[in-house]
């Protein structure tokens, strides 16, 4: 893979361009405005990628700094003054960073947390307010956003089928089931209980044997996904195979869910048996249902809620 080369000298005015934002933190009933757009914060911003810098922070002989990732991109030349960078660490700036507390970068999406500088990255990688990645598995889609955006994106850009209701009944047909390559066959989105769920069905190699797998993902966080249960069933010729479990959150990648085998897995010989006929064509009908587990606030007993459709 080729690395980007940065040949132009960056103006000081561009380096120190302010990125104004603020957050609030409650202390003893009073609201404190946190405004990290200070000179110290700006010093910790890499002039090349504009991200916050973390150790090792590099500097040239004239004191211009940049992050370790961008150091390799500029071919050991300072992007500000063009002097050779060498291997000089800016230890003073690294030490100053230890004393800072900054808002989460998802403050504008609702996160009001304030974090020590060196803990901020870890929080942001797990922040409940961070955008969701596109759950479509047929391509490496880079789209991110909230659930409303992703539902529209799946419908309009990926042409995914949309259904309302908590039951599903789908038929999957393949003309030559003996030729199975890793491929996503279908993704369907269901809306029920005011939430969205993605039903995946695909074929892939499990060891030396081809298998078919169906599983459900919840379009939301894991804590909310635990409120729901789903069942899947496939059958034919007087036999059936069932699965019941909790949908995984779309925070877990499609590959992670698939590789954990957390769903209905159908071996090829069983899939052909369910298909009937001369076993030269795959004809699988997968049915299922989603329901919600709610706890009665008075008795503490879990109540199963089924939707009307």
Swiss-Prot record:
Sites where the protein binds Zn(2+) 2: 134, 141, 153, 158
Tissue: Expressed at low level in the vascular tissue of mature roots. Expressed in lateral roots and in elongation zone of the main root upon stimulation by auxin. Colocalizes with NAC021/NAC022.
Pathway assignment: Protein modification; protein ubiquitination
Binding residues annotated for Zn(2+) 1, in chain numbering: 104, 111, 123, 127
Keywords: Cytoplasm, Metal-binding, Nucleus, Transferase, Ubl conjugation pathway, Zinc, Zinc-finger
GO cellular component entries: cytoplasm; nucleus
Molecular function (Gene Ontology), one example: zinc ion binding
Zn finger limits (RING-type): 46-82
Presence of keyword Transferase: yes
Domain remark text: The RING-type zinc finger domain is essential for ubiquitin ligase activity.
Protein name: E3 ubiquitin-protein ligase SINAT5
Gene designation: SINAT5
């Amino acid at each position: 893979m080729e690395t980007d080369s940065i040949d132009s000298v960056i103006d000081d005015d561009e380096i120190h361009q302010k990125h104004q934002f603020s957050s609030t933190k409650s202390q003893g009933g009073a609201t404190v405005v946190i405004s990290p757009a200070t000179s110290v914060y700006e010093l910790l911003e890499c002039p090349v990628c504009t991200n916050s810098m973390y150790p090792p922070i590099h500097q040239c002989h004239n004191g211009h700094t940049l992050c370790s990732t961008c150091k390799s991109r500029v071919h050991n030349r300072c992007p500000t003054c063009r002097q050779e960078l060498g291997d000089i660490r800016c230890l003073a700036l690294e030490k100053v960073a230890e004393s800072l507390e900054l808002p989460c970068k998802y403050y504008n999406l609702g996160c009001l947390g304030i974090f020590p500088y060196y803990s901020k990255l870890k929080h942001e990688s797990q922040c409940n307010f961070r955008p969701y990645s596109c759950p479509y598995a047929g391509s490496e889609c880079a789209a991110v956003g909230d659930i409303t955006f992703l539902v529209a994106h799946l419908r309009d850009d990926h042409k995914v089928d949309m259904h309302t209701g908590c039951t599903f009944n789908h038929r999957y047909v393949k003309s030559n089931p003996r030729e199975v390559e890793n491929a996503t066959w279908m993704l369907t989105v269901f809306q029920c209980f005011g939430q969205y769920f993605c039903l995946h069905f695909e074929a892939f190699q499990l060891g030396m044997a081809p298998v078919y797998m169906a599983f459900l993902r919840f379009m939301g966080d894991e804590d909310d996904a635990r409120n729901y249960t789903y069942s899947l069933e496939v059958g034919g010729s007087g036999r059936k195979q069932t699965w019941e479990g909790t949908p995984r959150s779309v925070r877990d990648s499609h590959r992670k869910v698939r590789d954990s085998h957390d769903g209905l897995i159908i071996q090829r010989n069983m899939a052909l048996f369910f298909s009937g006929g001369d076993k030269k064509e795959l004809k699988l009908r997968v049915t299922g249902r989603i329901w919600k587990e709610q706890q009665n606030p008075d008795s503490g007993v879990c109540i199963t809620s089924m939707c009307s459709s």
